[in-house]
Amino acid sequence: MTDMQSTTKSSLTEDQAHTYEATSSAATPRSWLHSLIAAQTQHWPEYLMEAAGLGLFMISACTFAVILDHPASFVRNAIPNSFVRRTLGGIAMGLTAIGLIYSPWGKRSGAHLNPSLTLTFFRLGKIAPADAFSYVFSQFAGGVAGVMFSAALWGGAVTDQNIRYAATLPGLRGVGVAFAAEAVISFLLMTVVLNASNSARLASLTGVFAGVLVALYISLEAPLSGMSMNPARTFASLSPGKFGMLFGSTSQRPL
């Protein structure tokens, strides 16, 4: 979620800024490809960290979905109230987000974990085009890998209709309401992140603010849209439908 300890610039820092300036001044296909290759050579650790970050987030999402909502779960049977379970899930995912943001890897990569956030910083000129492309690709790949791992870990439990790989789906009020709700919560999150991370007094708390919002959104807004705000996270949960044979094989426990 950018460099949570200082500014909205990604923690790729000065060499990234130089790459951005060079790319902007000579935006030919060949120069862009050269910048992409150079970025891959210099910043591949950060790309892997972004992939691992969203992968771990998806593992956490699938795990807590199984624990809280699977019909055979002791927790679900002990806590029949869906709002209470959703609140517990929100707290769990908020803490997951905070942990990832303030982890050593999160501090180094900037913990974007979300293509929307990466593209926002790209639009603001705070991340180079080649790095933005690689971050987004890594986030999608990491999210899918996290869901695949969850399928192997939980087997058929993660395919239950109450879990569905922790998919974020529109609620009973329809797609229009879900779209509007996602727009509102995304706007609020970005407003908080940009303002807090640009404040010398609040910058170090930006990750906490983001985690608290995630917890509140899951608790209160999830019935409307499923609470995603993250296209890579949504794609990861829906990808089993696109790669059914692959996920079918990984979701079967060894005999």
What do these predicted ranges mean?
Residues 1-255:
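Membrane-interface helix-loop junctions and terminal tails of multi-pass membrane proteins
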